[in-house]
Regions:
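Small-residue hinge/turn detector
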Residues: 119-131
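Intrinsically disordered, low-complexity polyampholyte segments enriched for Lys and acidic residues
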Residues: 22-24, 32-34, 53, 179
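Glycosyltransferase-associated regions of secretory-pathway enzymes
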Residues: 51-118, 136-317
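Tryptophan (W) side chains
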Residues: 14, 28-30, 35, 40, ...
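Extreme N-terminal basic, low-complexity initiation segments
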Residues: 2-11
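Intrinsically disordered, low-complexity segments enriched in serine/threonine/proline/glycine
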Residues: 12, 18-19
Length: 317
């Protein structure tokens, strides 16, 4: 069964047209006022086409700005090597990616908002080469060959804006620049795997290329990706979904950490942990420091009491 999305559909059509006549049989029939095409391919051709649509064994990550990789990022990359042996790991930075490729990327780079540069870069690289992508704060804890073998994938997270609004951290929501109202978001940074030429990525690239300027308050890659997937049929339900040729996995697969509390809930499905370093947020703001302090207190005294005290304080502030 082929994933029906623009990229794979077009590749399949060209694949059929390029094959010698003796290696395929094409039958047309007229049924209920519509033409239907039945194509028979030899088993070797099916195998070849499947191989062309497999996710390559490459792990991509982005690191713009020229600073050395922090220790936490190095540990995460080491976990990729441990649980995904045999994969080539490629870093993308100023030396091998054009940061002037479009106005959005150029202005984000000039503003030193490197996480937003990587939002575009990951899609361009994956559309061209295919493979896996992880943010540098993603720790892999189990082998995920079964997920890669199942085809193109992304994963859900609970919207950071929704979580912060539940806390009452309105100032942090504004500083973050993400849009509210999404109980679930599809976050490409958690883990993203695709074969080359996926149509969904082409649409995302076109979206970014059409933006005349970069502005943090316009939204994040989670907002843009989720909105596009909704146009393709994504529903607001926490379950595994197939949308636009991509499997969207539930939160527990790639995002077991609660970004509000820092609590990690592992299940048998969990293959990685996103540690939410949030490099795109100003870590010097009072609201962010308060958010981190609350997480540490939850770790010491438990979520129930700290959240209760937090709600009481908010009512009297």
């Amino acid at each position: 069964v082929l994933p029906i999305c623009r990229g794979s559909y077009i590749r399949f059509c060209w694949f059929i047209l390029a094959m010698p006549l003796e290696m395929k049989l094409i039958h047309w029939c007229w049924y209920e006022k519509k033409w239907y095409c039945y194509i028979w391919l030899s088993p070797c051709l099916w195998l070849l086409f499947i191989m062309l649509n497999m996710i390559p064994k490459i792990i991509h990550y982005c690191w713009f700005g020229g600073n050395p990789l922090p220790e936490d990022a190095q540990k995460c990359i080491a976990s990729w090597k441990k649980y995904l042996p045999g994969y080539e790991i490629k870093e993308w930075n100023e030396s091998n990616f054009d940061v002037n490729c479009c106005p959005y990327v150029r202005e984000a780079y000039q503003a030193k908002k490197y996480a937003f540069v990587s939002d575009y870069a990951r899609f361009e690289v994956l559309y061209r080469e295919g493979g896996l992508y992880f943010d540098t704060d993603v720790e892999v804890i189990r082998n995920m060959d079964h997920i890669v073998a199942a085809g193109n994938f992304m994963a859900f997270e609970k919207s950071l804006a929704t979580k912060l609004q539940e806390e009452g951290s309105v100032s942090t929501v504004k500083a973050v620049g993400v849009k509210s109202g999404l109980a679930l978001g599809v976050a490409p940074g958690l883990g993203l795997g695709v074969a080359p030429g996926l149509g969904l990525l082409h649409e995302l690239l076109e979206f970014y290329q059409a933006k005349e300027h970069f502005a943090v308050e316009d939204g994040t890659v989670v907002d843009y990706t989720t909105a596009l997937l909704r146009k393709h049929g994504l529903v607001e339900e926490h379950r595994l979904q197939q949308v636009a040729g991509v499997t969207i996995y539930p939160v527990d697969y790639f995002c077991p950490m609660d970004s509000t509390t820092g609590i990690i809930t592992l299940t048998d499905n969990t293959v990685s942990i996103h540690h939410y370093s949030c490099s795109w947020i100003d870590h010097n703001t009072f609201s962010w420091r308060l958010h981190i302090l609350k997480n540490k207190l939850i770790g010491l005294f438990g979520e129930k009491w700290i959240m209760k005290i937090s709600r009481i304080l908010k009512r009297h502030m």
